[in-house]
């Protein structure tokens, strides 16, 4: 198969995976799919959460780290790759934006999110990261958390981010790559036409989250049947999987970035 087709194949494969997840995993309490973020510095104060949010603490802390990097009060916010909607819903109810639109390629995930999350100013729509169904300069901020590794090369996605952002808007990004691929990701971000305001390596925070959240995720995954159990172990980067080890050894590096449109 030619290299030109590989990005499309990657997108199709991940699309199939997330459609399957959304259609088969009906547990309404499962609204986040990221690896999470935990403090690693002595003396760091835990994020204050409502009691209902406590089970999702580490997932929420990643969204707080990424989306909380700029003031979203009164802003129109887009999340690309909103999954099961927990991140968009958290941003909407805690950061006082004017609106939050969650967009995902998997229509089943969009349908789940529409049913599961209801809040003034919050909506979910189907759409592709490389052809967003929005007018130019529609949003003050675009959020993208742990999703871009499913896209292949990012040039078209970043072009779309640039297009839908208003002048002086922000792109709030977090994802991981292998040690061999991380510099290519940085180059793609640098050549996007957006100005890099800040980059933070958060691999230790993500790995600590995987350690602390292991038991809760294991108990959730044990509800699934044996045929898919081993797949979900790896998907969730449970202890003992190669994904868990890749963050422990640094083979995978996780970064968060704030970029601004001039």
Which positions does each model-derived feature cover?
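N-terminal auxiliary segments of SAM/dcSAM-dependent transferases
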Residues: 1-34
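Conserved Class I S-adenosyl-L-methionine
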Residues: 203-262
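A short acidic, Gly/Pro-enriched loop at the edge of an enzyme's catalytic core
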Residues: 130-142
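Class I SAM-dependent methyltransferase SAM/SAH-binding core
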Residues: 78-80, 84-131
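A short glycine-rich, Lys/Arg-flanked "PGG" loop and its adjoining helix->strand segment in the class I
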Residues: 155-167
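A short SAM/SAH-binding and catalytic strip from SAM-dependent methyltransferases
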Residues: 141-152
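Conserved alpha-helix/loop element of class I SAM-dependent methyltransferases that forms part
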Residues: 56-73
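Conserved beta-strand signature within the Rossmann-like core of class I S-adenosyl-L-methionine
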Residues: 169-175
């Amino acid at each position: 198969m030619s290299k030109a087709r590989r990005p499309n194949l990657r997108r199709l494969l991940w699309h199939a995976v997330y459609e399957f997840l959304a259609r088969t995993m009906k547990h309404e309490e499962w609204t986040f799919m990221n690896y999470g973020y935990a403090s690693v510095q002595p003396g760091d104060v835990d994020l204050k959460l409502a009691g209902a949010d406590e089970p999702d603490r580490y997932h929420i802390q990643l969204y707080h780290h990424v989306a909380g990097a700029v003031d979203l009060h009164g802003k129109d916010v887009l999340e690309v790759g909103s999954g099961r909607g927990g991140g968009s819903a958290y941003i909407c109810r805690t950061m006082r934006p004017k609106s939050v639109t969650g967009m995902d390629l998997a229509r089943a995930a969009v349908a789940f999110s529409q049913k599961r999350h209801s809040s003034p100013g919050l909506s979910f729509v189907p759409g592709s990261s490389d052809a967003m169904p929005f007018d130019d300069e529609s949003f003050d901020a675009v959020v993208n958390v742990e999703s871009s590794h499913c896209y292949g090369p990012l040039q078209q996605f970043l072009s779309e981010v640039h297009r839908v952002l208003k002048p002086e808007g922000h792109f709030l990004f977090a994802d991981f790559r292998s040690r061999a691929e991380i510099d290519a990701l940085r180059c793609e971000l640098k050549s996007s036409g957006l100005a890099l305001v800040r980059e933070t390596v958060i691999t230790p925070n993500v790995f600590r989250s995987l350690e602390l959240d292991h038991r809760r995720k294991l108990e959730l995954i044990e509800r699934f049947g044996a045929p898919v159990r081993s797949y979900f172990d790896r998907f969730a980067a449970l202890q003992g999987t190669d994904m868990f080890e890749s963050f422990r050894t640094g083979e995978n590096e996780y970064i968060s970035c704030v970029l601004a449109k001039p």
